[in-house]
A protein has these predicted regions:
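Glycine-rich hexapeptide-repeat left-handed beta-helix
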Residues: 1-7, 13, 46, 55, ...
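Extended, small-residue-rich solenoid/repeat segments and analogous flexible loops
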Residues: 1-35, 41, 86
Length: 163
């Protein structure tokens, strides 16, 4: 059997068909669902869920306890801090199916999302934007290089490519 060009911990699951780039590492208790595409040189921490059809760019770092639900797309070199949250329905209800109401979330190249931040679905986060830990992003567009923080998140300043 040919050795895979990526690492998957023995407790993690990767459903087929999916695509995992060379040099990527998928750690303990993580689950990559079918039709997911994960770029080269990514690192998915413990207990990460990558939903059906999710796209993750090259060099992305997803820390532990993050769920990337269907409709999430992460550009190259995005950082997702521990336990940050992406939603996929605006007003979920247990007894009402809302799968036809999923709203996509796009995160641009080099953006950083802090620990425990919440990104409400339907949001586009610009390239190199920085979402502070614990922030709740509810606006539809976060500009490139914006520094966002608070509940709800507001622009606090500007960042550079280098932080």
């Amino acid at each position: 059997m040919k050795e895979k060009p990526y690492f998957v911990h023995e407790s993690a699951y990767v459903d087929e068909p999916s695509s995992i780039g060379a040099g990527t590492k998928i750690w303990h208790f993580s689950h990559v669902m079918k039709h997911a595409v994960i770029g080269e040189a990514c690192n998915l921490g413990q207990n990460v869920v990558v939903g059906i059809g999710v796209r993750v760019g090259r060099g992305v770092r997803v820390q532990s306890n993050v769920s990337l639900y269907e409709g999430v797309e992460l550009g190259d070199y995005v950082f997702c801090g521990p336990s940050c949250v992406f939603t996929n329905v605006v007003n979920p209800r247990a007894e009402i199916s809302r799968k036809d109401e999923f709203r996509p979330t796009r995160v641009g190249r080099g953006a950083s999302i802090g620990a425990n931040a919440t990104i409400v679905c339907g949001t586009t986060i610009g390239s190199y934007a920085f979402i502070a830990a614990g922030a709740v992003v509810t606006r539809s567009v976060v500009p490139d290089y914006a520094l966002m923080g608070g509940v709800p998140a507001k622009r606090l300043g500007w960042m550079s490519r280098h932080g």
